[in-house]
């Protein structure tokens, strides 16, 4: 699901809200979450999951084009940990296209 699909679905489910208002709400929520993470804060949405930053230490990488070694600096990357309710909700879901891969 893309951001525009989410806005469209929410607009249909909440018919009393204008599409522009839903668009603004979704964009504001995502902006606030991005701002909180970039400020080093952790975001926890009970039942859904938590967003935090994980540190990736400096390492030696390789330029795939030339094959030469490149020193890569340490950095923080966003990390999502699903909550218990979300894990339980998706535990029995089989992604599309994988049904034929099951062998008995």
Curated annotation (Swiss-Prot):
Stored CDD domains: IHF_B (cd13836)
Sample GO molecular function, one term: DNA binding
Statement: the UniProt record of this protein carries the keyword rRNA-binding: no
Keywords: DNA recombination, DNA-binding, Transcription, Transcription regulation, Translation regulation
GO cellular component terms given for this protein: chromosome; cytosol
Keyword field contains Transcription regulation: yes
SMART domains named in the record: BHL
Disulfide bonds: none
One Gene Ontology biological process: regulation of DNA-templated transcription
Gene3D superfamilies per the UniProt record, alphabetical: IHF-like DNA-binding proteins
PANTHER family on file: DNA-BINDING PROTEIN HU (PTHR33175), INTEGRATION HOST FACTOR SUBUNIT BETA (PTHR33175:SF5)
Family that this chain belongs to: Belongs to the bacterial histone-like protein family.
NCBIfam families registered for this protein in UniProt: hip, PRK00199.1
Subunit structure comment from the entry: Heterodimer of an alpha and a beta chain.
The protein's role, per its UniProt record: This protein is one of the two subunits of integration host factor, a specific DNA-binding protein that functions in genetic recombination as well as in transcriptional and translational control.
Name of the protein this chain belongs to: Integration host factor subunit beta
The species this protein was found in: Xylella fastidiosa (strain Temecula1 / ATCC 700964)
Upper classification of the organism: Bacteria, Pseudomonadati, Pseudomonadota, Gammaproteobacteria, Lysobacterales
């Amino acid at each position: 699901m893309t951001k525009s699909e989410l806005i469209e679905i929410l607009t249909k489910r909440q018919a009393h809200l204008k599409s522009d208002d839903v668009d603004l709400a979704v964009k504001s929520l995502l902006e606030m979450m991005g701002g909180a993470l970039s400020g080093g804060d952790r975001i926890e949405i009970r039942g859904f999951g938590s967003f935090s930053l994980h540190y990736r230490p400096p390492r030696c990488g390789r330029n795939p084009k030339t094959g030469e070694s490149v020193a890569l600096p340490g950095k923080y990357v966003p990390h999502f940990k699903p909550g218990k309710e979300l894990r339980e909700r998706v535990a029995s879901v089989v992604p599309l296209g994988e049904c034929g891969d099951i062998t008995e």
